[in-house]
Amino acid sequence: MSARLAPAAAVGRVRPFRPDDLADVVGLRRRLFRFTERPSPAELADYCYRIFCRNPWSDDELPSLIYEDQRGEVAGFLGVVPRRMTFQDKPIRVAIGTQLMVSPESRGLAGRRLVRAFLTGPQDLSVSDLGNDATRRLWESLGGSVSMAHSVIWEKALRPCQLAVSRLGGGALGRGAALAAQPLVALGDALAAAWPGAHGRPAGGDTVPLAPATLAAAAEEVLQTFALRPDYNGALAWLLGQAAEKREFGELIGGLVRQSDGAVAGWFLHYVEPGGTSEVLQLAGRPSSRALVLGHLLEDARRRGAIAVAGRLEPAWLPELAAQGCALRDDGPWVLYHSSRPEVAAAMERGDAFLSRLDGEWWLSF
């Protein structure tokens, strides 16, 4: 669209979000997005206030952004959640972009101006890890990059027959076929489970419940091998509490995996619902213990009734995932990033960054 054909967009402006914008932002979101985990306007407004105004990393220099149209009305929004990470053992500022939305009347330059304002902020690293194809194109056109490795999704079938049936088309025909196939599905999964090495059950070690303080201490040890890694700095209790409110994929479960000698091997956080796919929020382990940690994750999901486990790829885990027969796909969502510091961008490019779903926007539950 040429500038001549979009005079209204030319006179709009991007400004910092204020708490008194909440009603307008909630109204805009309810107009544009069909899915929400918070159906009432009051509940959604309260959640937006908590995330954008009262998170533990609030930074006046990293506000969420509003696009005002030529009439001074809220016509666009880009949420910003400041986070902290360390790069080569020194603190850096990170900004997570989320909930980009623009009213139909202002589409075109408005979204571009919001993303440009976000990427040119004072943060060392900008991240958005739920990008669709349109967002990816916009992001890259403004100088941002996509982490292809971190955008890969892996999946391990635990009950392969039930998983296949769950992906039949909807409607009466699909439901009827699924119902008729139940006896064969149960038999097929029983035979698959009996096959030697079918689930790769862990040999040794044990899993205990994962508390925020335990995770924080383990992260200090286990993540040291990454040049770029999260700095939770006392905020894990808040972060995990918010993540637990995400109910789309079931209950959030965490497990600390210990080696046979009691030493910490790693941990996992995943959402589990019986009969569904367990979605991994975070998976971490010492290089020598990754196979053990992955085995305990898969066993925990199987024991809780999941039919599959899926997560976002950490490149260093490829050998262990391959050994478990995990499938890979790269059809999005895209993990997008931008940094004005070449050395930080290089760490992302070469996979020397620990960036789990807990460290972006994926855990949010709007």
Region locations from a protein language model:
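Amphipathic alpha-helical segments in well-structured domains
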Residues: 94, 111-115, 132, 136
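Conserved acetyl-CoA-binding loop-helix of GNAT-fold acetyltransferases
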Residues: 99-121, 128, 288-300
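Active-site/acyl-donor-binding loops of N-acyltransferases
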Residues: 2-9, 63, 125-193, 243-245, ...
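Amide-forming acyltransferase catalytic core, primarily the GNAT-like/NAT-type
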Residues: 3-6, 23-87, 92, 145-275
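Residues that line or immediately flank small-molecule/substrate-binding pockets and catalytic motifs
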Residues: 81-82, 99, 104, 130, ...
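Conserved acetyl-CoA binding element of GNAT-fold acetyltransferases
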Residues: 91-104, 276-286
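Extreme N-terminal starter segment of soluble prokaryotic enzymes
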Residues: 12-13
